[in-house]
């Protein structure tokens, strides 16, 4: 009894499978013609192929083989649904010369290479019933093009030659005979080892679904480069402040109002940002210091203190984090700064063009004055262009000065040419039409 049940179950399974096959082939039978007189082959994605042909399509050939894009797809009707057919694909040259890409176009370039072995690709579904071939479009997506004769079902093509795919339908099962072969001019291409035309590259990326990952990665890299480019532009503007003039470059600040008077030192903390002040982290060391390292040593302190004396002169006081300056004798360093006493452009008064920076602090040096170094070495630098984040009011105050620092054991000469000061608000007591600058109360006079 159990054997009979098993036999019936097996018959039911076979019947179900045959029904699946029958229903699968039914769609193909509806398009069939036992006489094969109405046999027809249609190219799928013809508009896409035509778009590539307009700019001369290119296909990559590699040693290991590269698949085609666009993929060759065809639809077949008019086959005998019950007959067996195999579909084959090969590539034939369309002309008798090589090609080269010159000045944005393909031009003939001499005689062709000797034709290699004619390789034929057999569709992996072959052989099969005509109903199978007619039920859905036939794709040759697994075809690989190579420039080496290595077998494995790959199609060998010569680079820089133009080819056209040809589809062949062969009836099998009994006497084999050719039923039809056809080709489509839209599918012509030049075999290359790398794309020559940028338009072809763009079309491949745009329409090839397997190239979307490459496109997305390219876009991600582009978006990632945007903040890097912005950061780089900030470095170009401010990086010289970080490793050159200011002892602690973590704070870069401009006055938010014209009443810039503080009775006590004003610290510029690095960890936060407030109105009129922007924090630029990571600028220290962006550029190399302009002086030999033998004369400069770095200490560390958390902030830079700004204080304005009773004479309204802005001073910069560096904490322990400062450049250890050159040692010099009390009367060894003399600075002479020539400056034109002509009127300054109308508008906000500029910051002084020169700053003193040392361990003990120093004040701004007005144009047209002399400063005598009487402490343990003073480094006098020009004030480069500093852009105010709140308002951009460039005021040109050029000074051609020669700065000489006598140090031990050698003489260091620093030529400072054009210095530009940019102010956002006027400061009383700093220059002005017809007026000379002042020395701060902490300026060092001999």
Swiss-Prot record:
SMART domains: TBOX
Keyword Metal-binding assigned: no
Highest taxon of the lineage: Eukaryota
GO MF, one annotated term: cis-regulatory region sequence-specific DNA binding
Keyword line: Activator, DNA-binding, Nucleus, Repressor, Transcription, Transcription regulation
Keyword Cell inner membrane: no
GO biological process, one term: pituitary gland development
GO annotation, cellular component aspect: nucleus
DNA-binding span(s): 43-216
Cell location: Nucleus
Purpose: Transcriptional regulator involved in developmental processes. Can activate POMC gene expression and repress the alpha glycoprotein subunit and thyroid-stimulating hormone beta promoters.
Protein name, as recorded: T-box transcription factor TBX19
Native source species: Mus musculus (Mouse)
Gene: Tbx19
